[in-house]
Amino acid sequence: MRPSRLLIRCVLSLAALATIASVAASQTPSPARLLVLLRNASALAIVDPASGHVLGRVPVGKDPHEVAVTPDGKMAFVASPSEGISVIDVPAMKELRRVDTGALSAPHDVLYAGGKVYFTAEGFKTIGRYDPAANKIEWMLGIGQDGTHMMVLAKDQQTMWVPNRGSNSISVIDGVAGGPPKFRTTAIPVPGKTPEGLDLSPDGRELWTATRGDGGVSIIDTTSRKVTQSFNLKLTDANRLKFTPDGKVLILDGGTGTLIVLDAASRKEIKRLKVAPGDTGDGGVFVMPDGSRAYLGLRDDHSVVVIDLKTLEIANRFAMGPNSGPGCINWAFLR
């Protein structure tokens, strides 16, 4: 065989192998998963974050509100106000068990930290902690405020911040990891109405909360435990607020289907991005830890919108199916 023909065959073979490898790589599923609560469908959707393809649905309690996940991505915990907390095996895509938090307790938010699952029980005006390894509720703590709803935990996992919608206050629980009787609670009144969405700044110095009842934002200094600033953004239904790693604040205004982007340092508005044609109902905002993207669950639009946080534009939209009602979103990286 002539050397030139041999060379051509080698080049063609290498090209074919490269094509096969490329196809194989494109067909290899990513270990990352989006966990999307489908409130209308009462299910947890497990989604390929690259394609938006729904890999499976796990039935959970009625009208699920929030979802937490373990660092290894293998277990998720879903709160249903009427049917307790579902414990989910993410790789197997099945519910392992359901935790009864008590009649009329109305669990709403869930947060995984230090091997435990913290949850709010809005009906009892309490927070609680569940040990998934022992499958038992370790304790419940009375907050003494109405509408105990969401929660956020400081990086040291010792201080928790909880908005109380009915009392127009934020509760601070110090020493929460130690359990009773080691912790203490303090209620901080906020000037706005119905605080709900909240988050801590990346440096932990400020807590921001969106006041859903009047379209504003209140900022608390985490050292002095005082409200330092409030301003009205004239929003119609600001129910979720999240920080990005670089210090932006994202607020989802479900009433107008708009994402508001603020610069936390200057307190200035950067952009208002239309993400749906109209009212999206209750929604969810999840920010990737690397700050590259944000995912918005738009309940009444039955979609998940992907935001490029560099360009602040819509990068993709994933349809979740008719009458699915996507809300809270979390991220599982299967290890």
Q: Predicted segment positions?
A:
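Predominantly soluble domains enriched in secretory-pathway, periplasmic, or organellar proteins
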Residues: 16-335
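Bacterial N-terminal signal peptides that target proteins for export
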Residues: 1-12
